[in-house]
Amino acid sequence: QFFEVEEQINSHLSKSSASVSGKIRIVADSAIHIIQILKSFRKIYPDVMVDLTIGNSREVTNAIRNYDAEIGVIGSPVEGPDLQTVTLGTSKIKAIASKKFFSPIPNSLSFQDLRKLPLIFRENGSHTRETLVSEALEKKIELSPVIEVTGREALHELVANGLGVGFVSYAEIGQDPRLVNLDIDTGNAEMTETLMYLTARKEVPVIRAFLKAAEKP
């Protein structure tokens, strides 16, 4: 358990005040999914510094398993005896486009429609991409991007400027007035937002503290 030496530096449990201090490293596929938990955590544990990094699902899982972060949040269920998980919620995958892209704007898009459109995908390792492509293949439809981009913010900008149609979970759409979101009417693809941490580190004070904050309504 030599990896836990880092916790003597990054966090500790003050027996005198029963408060947690130090730093917690969080890697998430989107900050949106943990905003409310972070608010609760900061209110309960104001002395803990939060280091938040954004990455795709593969990067998040690797960071947890490599001891590069205490908490991970991704848009898919995770399995493995080395991991403990908490389901935060589910959200359907939606197509997004510039309001000027379609004329008129359709109510929804089918996989057949998508195959004819310029698609913008996130990089390999994005669970949104993997889920969408997998479901389309089940219906014998192959979806291919004209642009592949790293990061959700870059995807939003390309889509908002009319370069193609992108995909995000409903929770990640945000408030960009340039965008319209559309149902994928032949699809049931959804994201299951999952909080994870290593089983071997379940007694680390900042991890226990974050889980406590996640339980708050």
Annotated model-derived regions:
Residues 181-217:
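A late-sequence structural motif
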